Amino acid sequence: MTHSKTDRLYANPLAQVSQFVFDENVVDVFPDMIKRSVPGYATIINMIGNLAERYTQSGSQCYDLGCSLGAATLAMRHRIQAADCKIIGVDSSAAMLQRCAQIMAADTSDIPVDLVEARIQDVPITNASVAVLNFTLQFIPLDERQSVLNNICAGLRPNGVLILSEKLAFEDETHQQLMIDLHHNFKRANGYSDLEIAQKRTSIENYLIPETLAAHRHRLRTAGFHSVDVWFQCFNFASLIAIK
C-alpha cells in the first residue's frame, strides 16, 4: 500500500509546464520524488519522531500540518511515549489524504490519528505539545505565513515545540547559486535528467517561495517562540526547532 512508483512526471518535454499541484499523479510518485529531491529527508523524518518522543506531553495533541502521505505522522506515532495523546494530520489535498488514510489504517500503532482536509491557515491549534510544518510553509503565501505561526504558537502548551522544515534562500548571491548547483547535482545523482530538473523548477516557480534563515527566525520570534535554532541543514534545505 505504501509502494511508490518512480517519479517520471517531468521526464518528457512538455509544451507548457503547468503549476505544480498535489494531485493523484503526484500522490503515486510522492515518496520517490521527495526521497530523490530533498537531501536529508529520511533523517529529518526520523528525527521528527525523536523530537516528538522528547517533547510530547501527556494528554496533548500533536499536529502534522501539511501531512501529505503521513511520513512525519508515522514517525511521531511510532516514537511517542506520553499517555493519552492524539495526532492530527492536516492537508488541503484530498488525493494525499485519501492515500494517507490507507497508510494509517495499515499501521499497527494504537495512537489515534485524525486526518483533516483543510488549509493550514484555517485550522485551529489547541492543546498542542508538538506541531510539524515539514516543507509546508514554503507553499503558503508570504503575507499569510506570520499568522500561521502566530496561530501555532498560541495553541501550543508551554514548552511545546514547532518543527519547521523549509527550502532556503540565501542573501549572498554566490552562496545562493552554489546551493542551487549542489542541489541540482544531488538530483542528477539520484537519476533526474536536466530536462526533469528544469521542468520541475518551472512548475514550482512562484508557488514554492523559499526564504532566508534570518526571515524564519524573525517570524518565529515574532510569533512568541523564545528559543529558535537550526537542528539540521543540508545545502538549501533546513529544519528548525522553535520552543514556546
UniProtKB/Swiss-Prot annotation:
Top-level class of the enzyme under EC nomenclature: transferase
| Xref: InterPro entries | CmoA, Methyltransf_25, SAM-dependent_MTases_sf
Gene Ontology terms, MF aspect: carboxyl- or carbamoyltransferase activity; S-adenosyl-L-methionine binding
Q: What is its EC number?
A: 2.1.3.-
Q: Does the keyword Chloroplast apply?
A: no
Coiled-coil segments:
none
Recorded hits in SUPFAM superfamilies, A to Z, give: S-adenosyl-L-methionine-dependent methyltransferases
According to the record's subunit comment, the protein's assembly and interactions are:
Homodimer.
Q: What is the designated name of this protein? A: Carboxy-S-adenosyl-L-methionine synthase
Which species does the entry assign this protein to? Cellvibrio japonicus (strain Ueda107) (Pseudomonas fluorescens subsp. cellulosa)
GN (gene name)? cmoA
